[in-house]
Amino acid sequence: MASVAGPEIDRLIQLLARLPGLGPRSARRAALHLIKKREALMTPLASALQVAIDRIQICEICGNIDTRSPCTVCTDMRRDPSIIVVVADVADLWALERAGATNGFYHVLGATLSPLDGVGPQDLTIDALVSRAHDPRVTEIVLALNATVDGQTTAHYITDLLGEANVKVTRLAHGVPVGGELDYLDEGTLSAAMRQRTPF
Protein backbone atom coordinates (compact mmCIF):
# COMPACT_ATOMS: atom_id res chain seq x y z
CA MET A 1 0.00 0.00 0.00
CA ALA A 2 1.36 3.39 -0.99
CA SER A 3 2.08 5.92 1.72
CA VAL A 4 -0.17 8.97 1.82
CA ALA A 5 2.10 10.88 4.22
CA GLY A 6 5.78 11.66 4.49
CA PRO A 7 8.32 9.23 5.96
CA GLU A 8 8.34 11.05 9.31
CA ILE A 9 4.62 10.46 9.80
CA ASP A 10 4.97 6.85 8.64
CA ARG A 11 7.72 6.41 11.23
CA LEU A 12 5.48 7.88 13.96
CA ILE A 13 2.72 5.42 13.02
CA GLN A 14 5.16 2.48 13.00
CA LEU A 15 6.47 3.39 16.45
CA LEU A 16 2.98 3.86 17.89
CA ALA A 17 1.97 0.46 16.47
CA ARG A 18 4.66 -1.15 18.65
CA LEU A 19 2.82 -0.09 21.82
CA PRO A 20 0.72 -2.77 23.54
CA GLY A 21 -2.91 -2.62 22.44
CA LEU A 22 -2.24 -0.54 19.33
CA GLY A 23 -2.36 -2.18 15.94
CA PRO A 24 -1.66 -0.41 12.64
CA ARG A 25 -5.16 1.09 12.38
CA SER A 26 -5.22 2.35 15.98
CA ALA A 27 -1.70 3.71 15.54
CA ARG A 28 -2.81 5.72 12.48
CA ARG A 29 -5.74 7.13 14.46
CA ALA A 30 -3.47 8.01 17.39
CA ALA A 31 -0.94 9.67 15.06
CA LEU A 32 -3.65 11.75 13.39
CA HIS A 33 -5.01 12.78 16.79
CA LEU A 34 -1.55 13.80 17.98
CA ILE A 35 -0.94 15.81 14.83
CA LYS A 36 -4.31 17.57 15.09
CA LYS A 37 -3.63 18.41 18.75
CA ARG A 38 -0.01 19.30 18.15
CA GLU A 39 0.32 22.15 20.65
CA ALA A 40 -2.05 20.75 23.29
CA LEU A 41 -0.88 17.13 23.17
CA MET A 42 2.04 16.32 20.89
CA THR A 43 4.50 18.91 22.23
CA PRO A 44 3.84 18.11 25.93
CA LEU A 45 4.02 14.39 25.13
CA ALA A 46 7.38 14.81 23.41
CA SER A 47 8.63 16.80 26.40
CA ALA A 48 7.38 14.16 28.87
CA LEU A 49 9.05 11.41 26.83
CA GLN A 50 12.35 13.29 26.87
CA VAL A 51 12.15 13.76 30.64
CA ALA A 52 11.41 10.03 31.00
CA ILE A 53 14.42 9.16 28.84
CA ASP A 54 16.66 11.44 30.90
CA ARG A 55 15.45 10.71 34.43
CA ILE A 56 13.76 7.31 34.75
CA GLN A 57 15.74 4.63 36.58
CA ILE A 58 15.26 1.14 37.94
CA CYS A 59 15.25 1.03 41.74
CA GLU A 60 18.39 -0.68 43.02
CA ILE A 61 16.44 -2.30 45.87
CA CYS A 62 13.08 -3.47 44.53
CA GLY A 63 13.20 -3.04 40.74
CA ASN A 64 10.43 -0.43 40.55
CA ILE A 65 10.59 2.30 37.91
CA ASP A 66 10.97 5.81 39.31
CA THR A 67 12.92 9.02 38.82
CA ARG A 68 15.22 8.12 41.70
CA SER A 69 16.89 5.08 43.20
CA PRO A 70 16.05 3.94 45.81
CA CYS A 71 12.50 4.60 44.65
CA THR A 72 9.67 6.45 46.39
CA VAL A 73 8.25 3.18 47.75
CA CYS A 74 11.55 1.94 49.18
CA THR A 75 12.26 5.27 50.91
CA ASP A 76 8.79 5.54 52.49
CA MET A 77 9.46 5.05 56.21
CA ARG A 78 5.73 4.60 56.92
CA ARG A 79 5.80 1.18 55.25
CA ASP A 80 5.97 -2.11 57.11
CA PRO A 81 9.53 -3.49 56.80
CA SER A 82 8.39 -6.98 57.82
CA ILE A 83 6.56 -7.62 54.51
CA ILE A 84 7.97 -8.01 51.01
CA VAL A 85 5.44 -8.47 48.22
CA VAL A 86 6.93 -10.29 45.22
CA VAL A 87 5.53 -9.35 41.79
CA ALA A 88 6.47 -10.35 38.26
CA ASP A 89 6.72 -6.83 36.85
CA VAL A 90 6.27 -3.16 37.62
CA ALA A 91 2.70 -3.11 36.26
CA ASP A 92 1.73 -5.54 39.04
CA LEU A 93 3.39 -3.34 41.68
CA TRP A 94 1.53 -0.30 40.38
CA ALA A 95 -1.79 -2.22 40.38
CA LEU A 96 -1.32 -3.21 44.04
CA GLU A 97 -0.41 0.38 44.93
CA ARG A 98 -3.52 1.74 43.16
CA ALA A 99 -5.63 -0.72 45.14
CA GLY A 100 -3.94 0.27 48.41
CA ALA A 101 -3.61 -3.48 49.00
CA THR A 102 -0.45 -3.46 51.12
CA ASN A 103 1.77 -1.19 53.15
CA GLY A 104 4.75 -3.49 52.80
CA PHE A 105 7.68 -3.24 50.43
CA TYR A 106 8.00 -4.88 47.01
CA HIS A 107 10.36 -6.99 44.96
CA VAL A 108 10.00 -7.02 41.15
CA LEU A 109 11.27 -10.24 39.55
CA GLY A 110 11.23 -8.86 36.00
CA ALA A 111 9.16 -11.80 34.67
CA THR A 112 8.16 -15.33 35.66
CA LEU A 113 9.99 -18.56 34.95
CA SER A 114 9.04 -19.75 31.48
CA PRO A 115 11.09 -22.56 29.93
CA LEU A 116 9.13 -22.25 26.67
CA ASP A 117 10.14 -18.59 26.38
CA GLY A 118 13.71 -19.27 27.51
CA VAL A 119 13.28 -17.43 30.84
CA GLY A 120 15.22 -19.16 33.62
CA PRO A 121 16.13 -18.28 37.22
CA GLN A 122 19.24 -16.42 36.04
CA ASP A 123 16.99 -13.98 34.13
CA LEU A 124 15.06 -12.96 37.25
CA THR A 125 16.08 -11.07 40.40
CA ILE A 126 15.56 -14.14 42.60
CA ASP A 127 19.04 -14.00 44.19
CA ALA A 128 18.40 -10.43 45.35
CA LEU A 129 15.04 -11.53 46.80
CA VAL A 130 16.66 -14.36 48.77
CA SER A 131 19.21 -11.88 50.10
CA ARG A 132 16.46 -9.47 51.15
CA ALA A 133 14.53 -12.31 52.82
CA HIS A 134 17.44 -12.85 55.22
CA ASP A 135 17.06 -9.31 56.62
CA PRO A 136 16.00 -9.88 60.26
CA ARG A 137 13.21 -7.30 59.92
CA VAL A 138 11.49 -9.36 57.20
CA THR A 139 8.99 -11.91 58.53
CA GLU A 140 6.73 -12.50 55.51
CA ILE A 141 7.19 -12.87 51.77
CA VAL A 142 3.92 -12.51 49.84
CA LEU A 143 4.01 -14.11 46.39
CA ALA A 144 1.70 -11.89 44.34
CA LEU A 145 2.20 -13.76 41.07
CA ASN A 146 -0.31 -14.53 38.35
CA ALA A 147 -2.33 -17.74 38.67
CA THR A 148 -0.78 -19.14 35.49
CA VAL A 149 1.44 -22.18 35.03
CA ASP A 150 4.50 -19.90 34.82
CA GLY A 151 3.39 -17.90 37.87
CA GLN A 152 2.80 -21.02 39.95
CA THR A 153 6.09 -22.58 38.81
CA THR A 154 7.91 -19.41 39.86
CA ALA A 155 6.10 -19.39 43.23
CA HIS A 156 7.13 -23.00 43.97
CA TYR A 157 10.73 -22.33 42.91
CA ILE A 158 10.97 -19.27 45.17
CA THR A 159 9.32 -21.09 48.07
CA ASP A 160 11.93 -23.85 47.84
CA LEU A 161 14.78 -21.31 47.81
CA LEU A 162 13.38 -19.48 50.83
CA GLY A 163 13.31 -22.65 52.92
CA GLU A 164 16.37 -21.59 54.92
CA ALA A 165 15.18 -18.02 55.49
CA ASN A 166 13.26 -17.43 58.69
CA VAL A 167 10.18 -16.04 56.90
CA LYS A 168 6.58 -17.05 56.35
CA VAL A 169 5.82 -17.44 52.62
CA THR A 170 2.24 -16.67 51.59
CA ARG A 171 0.48 -16.15 48.28
CA LEU A 172 -2.54 -14.21 47.14
CA ALA A 173 -5.88 -15.97 47.42
CA HIS A 174 -7.44 -17.14 44.18
CA GLY A 175 -11.12 -17.38 43.49
CA VAL A 176 -14.30 -15.46 42.88
CA PRO A 177 -13.68 -11.78 42.10
CA VAL A 178 -15.72 -9.14 43.92
CA GLY A 179 -18.91 -8.65 41.92
CA GLY A 180 -18.26 -11.83 39.92
CA GLU A 181 -21.04 -14.23 38.95
CA LEU A 182 -20.34 -17.95 39.30
CA ASP A 183 -21.86 -18.78 35.93
CA TYR A 184 -19.19 -16.71 34.16
CA LEU A 185 -16.15 -18.15 35.97
CA ASP A 186 -13.93 -20.88 34.56
CA GLU A 187 -13.64 -24.26 36.26
CA GLY A 188 -10.11 -23.62 37.57
CA THR A 189 -11.20 -20.42 39.33
CA LEU A 190 -14.24 -22.11 40.86
CA SER A 191 -12.15 -25.07 42.06
CA ALA A 192 -9.58 -22.73 43.63
CA ALA A 193 -12.35 -20.74 45.32
CA MET A 194 -13.85 -23.91 46.82
CA ARG A 195 -10.49 -25.18 48.08
CA GLN A 196 -9.59 -21.81 49.63
CA ARG A 197 -12.97 -21.02 51.16
CA THR A 198 -12.96 -19.14 54.49
CA PRO A 199 -15.41 -18.86 57.42
CA PHE A 200 -18.16 -16.28 56.95
UniProtKB/Swiss-Prot annotation:
Classification via InterPro entries: DNA_Rcmb_RecR, Rcmb_RecR, Rcmb_RecR_Znf, TOPRIM_dom, TOPRIM_RecR
GO BP annotations listed: DNA recombination; DNA repair
Start and end residues, zinc fingers (C4-type): 59-74
SMART domains: TOPRIM
Ranges for domain Toprim: 82-177
Keywords: DNA damage, DNA recombination, DNA repair, Metal-binding, Zinc, Zinc-finger
Gene3D superfamilies found in the cross-reference section: 3.40.1360.10, 6.10.250.240, RecR Domain 1 (1.10.8.420)
Keyword flag Amino-acid biosynthesis: no
Gene Ontology MF annotations: DNA binding; zinc ion binding
Family listed: Belongs to the RecR family.
Protein purpose: May play a role in DNA repair. It seems to be involved in an RecBC-independent recombinational process of DNA repair. It may act with RecF and RecO.
Name listed for the protein in its UniProt record: Recombination protein RecR
Organism annotation: Nitrobacter hamburgensis (strain DSM 10229 / NCIMB 13809 / X14)
